[in-house]
Amino acid sequence: MCGILGIVLANQTTPVAPELCDGCIFLQHRGQDAAGIATCGSRGRIYQCKGNGMARDVFTQQRVSGLAGSMGIAHLRYPTAGSSANSEAQPFYVNSPYGINLAHNGNLVNTASLKRYMDEDVHRHINTDSDSELLLNIFAAELEKHNKYRVNNEDVFHALEGVYRLCRGGYACVGLLAGFALFGFRDPNGIRPLLFGERENPDGTKDYMLASESVVFKAHNFTKYRDLKPGEAVIIPKNCSKGEPEFKQVVPINSYRPDLFEYVYFARPDSVLDGISVYHTRLAMGSKLAENILKQLKPEDIDVVIPVPDTARTCALECANVLGKPYREGFVKNRYVGRTFIMPNQRERVSSVRRKLNPMESEFKGKKVLIVDDSIVRGTTSKEIVNMAKESGATKVYFASAAPAIRYNHIYGIDLTDTKNLIAYNRTDEEVAEVIGCERVIYQSLEDLIDCCKTDKITKFEDGVFTGNYVTGVEDGYIQELEEKRESIANNSSDMKAEVDIGLYNCADY
């Protein structure tokens, strides 16, 4: 999972980089591994700053001040099917045709056939393991077919038709065409989120933004915004004071199935994605979870409800309300330690849990505790949390998950882990409870989770992590390839290579 952002300012003398940098802070939760900005200045020149680390560390004042231009895109990387090396930091760039930058959120699931096509038919070299570089080169190859001195909007839309025809997976992208326009597009199933917004200036002109979550628009006074529909694209001219954005439904909507995990864990609670309030879905999750808990436990089995901060707080609070039990903050979070779920390897996650969370013994001692978390993935965090609760004097610990049991790979851009490392894989609920050391594990049902998120317009979701049924289908051998890449990353062999990869405008700044 990644965060993407694009902004075009009407005033072409105003640098866009500071606002892109600030926007990245609001999307930092979507990726802490690397950050990057690319801007387009006068005469179509591209400027960039990118590297491993948090946005605040990569985007120093000195670096940002060198990013000229009123149009730009940004990316926050959470490593998925590539390495976590500098050479994989986005946005990616190709100089032919026309000079193109691209930032991508998601995963392609037919990468093997696409790489063969690029090599054997198009003769374009893909230099990294990132499917984002692959997607960029597919778009570039489709655009190059027009063989024109300058492109227009229709050429770009036509090239995107080729991208949609060739690429399978969940993806949302923002890109720059040097000196011409900013563009964005979303996969035909709407798996990955992308929103468009506008902000009116005092002189009547408008600035435009594309972003992964609505929270960025509100923070920057973009009061009018909407979701791009599945299969829809938009082109925003560089000189947007003289030209309007153009939208096109490039391909028909295949289905409208946002990823359930956005609402369970990934998105900020103050965001609204596809017209669905993340906060209100999590409240509903807490209510439904409480109903399920009461089917399995007696009221006297629970003395207190304690959340795993931060994501589970909303769910846990509503769960406690429905149960009629006190809600307490039993864990103090060290905000200077990253989200353990997004950390690139297991060793970091294990050591991070106790650095990240410290129990308050008074909330556990002598009590029967219900701990609520958003999900149980590898079980790393859950096991350590149960241990801390018991070390702090809890007489019994029950563990409730706002999400159903996760037994399958996530293939659209969230690196849950290999299937065999999922704690619920080939285990019953009782066996999961035994592994993490608690008295009982209680999961949300998939039916209840969907009920918490659905609206009149959206009634189905991408739920492959819970069912094993993926909306796009999967190319033969893809999951094995995905797991081999993850293993390579875990062993650092991929990163050792990638740190010295050459990158024409793709290398990081440090």
From Swiss-Prot:
Under catalytic activity, the entry for this protein gives: 5-phospho-beta-D-ribosylamine + L-glutamate + diphosphate = 5-phospho-alpha-D-ribose 1-diphosphate + L-glutamine + H2O
One GO cellular component term, please give it: cytoplasm
Q: Where is the Glutamine amidotransferase type-2 domain?
A: 2-239
Which GO biological-process labels does this protein carry? 'de novo' IMP biosynthetic process; purine nucleobase biosynthetic process; purine nucleotide biosynthetic process
On the tree of life, the source organism's domain of life is Eukaryota
Which CDD domains would you find in this protein's record? GPATase_N, PRTases_typeI
- Report the EC code(s) recorded for this entry: 2.4.2.14
Binding-site positions, Mg(2+): D373, D374
Pfam families from the entry? GATase_6, Pribosyltran
Which keywords does this Swiss-Prot/TrEMBL entry list? Glutamine amidotransferase, Glycosyltransferase, Magnesium, Metal-binding, Purine biosynthesis, Transferase
Claim: Coiled coil is one of the keywords in the record = no
User: What pathway, per the record?
Assistant: Purine metabolism; IMP biosynthesis via de novo pathway; N(1)-(5-phospho-D-ribosyl)glycinamide from 5-phospho-alpha-D-ribose 1-diphosphate: step 1/2
Sorted alphabetically, which PROSITE patterns does this protein's record hold? GATASE_TYPE_2, PUR_PYR_PR_TRANSFER
Known NCBIfam families for this protein? purF (TIGR01134)
Q: Identify the HAMAP family for this entry.
A: PurF (MF_01931)
Q: What else is known?
A: Present with 18700 molecules/cell in log phase SD medium.
Annotated family = In the C-terminal section; belongs to the purine/pyrimidine phosphoribosyltransferase family.
Question: What is the protein name stated in its UniProt record?
Answer: Amidophosphoribosyltransferase
